[in-house]
Amino acid sequence: MLLLPSAAEGQGTAITHALTSASSVCQVEPVGRWFEAFVKRRNRNASTSFQELEDKKELSEESEDEELQLEEFPMLKTLDPKDWKNQDHYAVLGLGHVRYTATQRQIKAAHKAMVLKHHPDKRKAAGEPIKEGDNDYFTCITKAYEMLSDPVKRRAFNSVDPTFDNSVPSKSEAKDNFFQVFSPVFERNSRWSNKKNVPKLGDMNSSFEDVDAFYSFWYNFDSWREFSYLDEEEKEKAECRDERKWIEKQNRATRAQRKKEEMNRIRTLVDNAYSCDPRIKKFKEEEKAKKEAEKKAKAEARRKEQEAKEKQRQAELEAVRLAKEKEEEEVRQQALLAKKEKDIQKKAIKKERQKLRNSCKSWNHFSDNEADRVKMMEEVEKLCDRLELASLQGLNEILASSTREVGKAALEKQIEEVNEQMRREKEEADARMRQASKNAEKSTGGSGSGSKNWSEDDLQLLIKAVNLFPAGTNSRWEVIANYMNIHSSSGVKRTAKDVISKAKSLQKLDPHQKDDINKKAFDKFKKEHGVASQADSAAPSERFEGPCIDSTPWTTEEQKLLEQALKTYPVNTPERWEKIAEAVPGRTKKDCMRRYKELVEMVKAKKAAQEQVLNASRARK
């Protein structure tokens, strides 16, 4: 039934009768706020009471927005629209008293109120003067709403809120009233945290866990504060892509620097608070007392345990000492017995050798002229060096119990056997040397002037160079070859392959062949320097055993001690070499001086040879 209002005075009421048509079926689509509420409840699977609570919440927010009182900004009309970036946007909209806590509804309501009050059209209608374009102060209101209505831009402005206190209390300020000074500082800085439920500073009754959680949170503070609002250049003003990239790069660098300064400020705040916190001092004292008590208890338990172990250890040490003394005594007796046997053997050999010399001397060395006598003396000395004790005793018995002819025959037979043995050894060594030379020639191709004509001087020079440039020298064989080419008098140029081949063949030589090489070199030395060979034709010389110069090679440890001593005692140190010798056990002053000279000569020779190799390589380049 449709009810219409009654007609006004002076108007007539007309009744129109229309013919009603037959009923028809039509589709009706539900709309309206009540249907919307029904759909929300169904989608949330909520009851009507829940929806009523939601509606009440929205109504309460709207009522709060309506109750919000805006503060008039007295400097609003004096603001420069061109300098809008330096204005306080909250104060412009009248929200200076709520600032970052203002909701979007409040910001929107504040903007609406400011528009209704300060819109240029309304002021123009009221007769107020209006500036043209964007020069009117109303532009500042528009910019403020533009910044605060956008969550990203609002976050950027909140990060540089001009009313925020960035100061950090010093240690002296909080010496007596720590909680009153630092509590509000941490409270206002907690707004920058990305994490919710920021822990409070607490009081003197806070537990260790709460205090530790508080400082752990702030030492690992995760701040959302950023400084894009302070960018000096706006990339939107760039004329080209390159300029926009340059502006973005400059802005990123500036933001990163300001972010670093902000984190340093937070770190300084936490450091100052931690150093002044009386609870930290209390916890440290409690921890120290606890550790001291535990330490004393452990020390007492350790002392008792140590006493028991010490008694057992002393008993074990005594048993070990007795066993060791017994073992050492046995070893000493064995060594003494071995030394006695060795001395007896040595004396017996020496006695038999002297007896052989005397027997031969008594028979005038079985010779009638001086030349044969000298030759026989050499052969006798050879027998003394080569024969064993049993052979010497047997030969001496024959000489002592036989006639001159029988003794001479026995002596000559023994000499012949020794010479034959030496000859065989030499032939075997020569065969090995020839085989080694053939192998070396095969490995080097069997040609080249460097693989032949190795004189005695070149062999000695090679041995000297190998000793002078030990393994580990950079380009060792090239350096050795260059050294030989510089110092060799043969004029034959040697390559690194020639030197390597000859060095390998020398390593395979028999010891007697090495002695022959050294002997030939010494004979040449005597010939060049005019050293006359001296021989006593009257009697064989006697050899006396006495102290000789220590030719023991220097070990790595001794070398290190020598080098350290040379650094410790400089040249101007009085009695320098005596002190150096004391620092190197087992070495005399002469040993240290001789080793030092060898090292100096070795370094000089290495430098010279390496310079030659370097110059040669540069010349080839």
UniProtKB/Swiss-Prot annotation:
Residues 160-250 are annotated as: ZRF1-UBD. Residues 422-453 are annotated as: Disordered. Transmembrane segments: none annotated. Expressed in all tissues. Keywords: Acetylation, Activator, Chaperone, Chromatin regulator, Cytoplasm, Nucleus, Phosphoprotein, Repeat, Transcription, Transcription regulation. GO terms for cellular component: cytosol; nuclear membrane; nucleolus; nucleus. Disulfide bonds: none annotated. The modification Phosphoserine is found at S47, S49, S60, S63, S183. One of its GO terms (biological process) is DNA replication. The modification N-acetylmethionine is found at M1. Residues 449-511, 549-604 form the SANT domain. The keyword Isomerase does not apply. This is DnaJ homolog subfamily C member 2. The gene is Dnajc2.
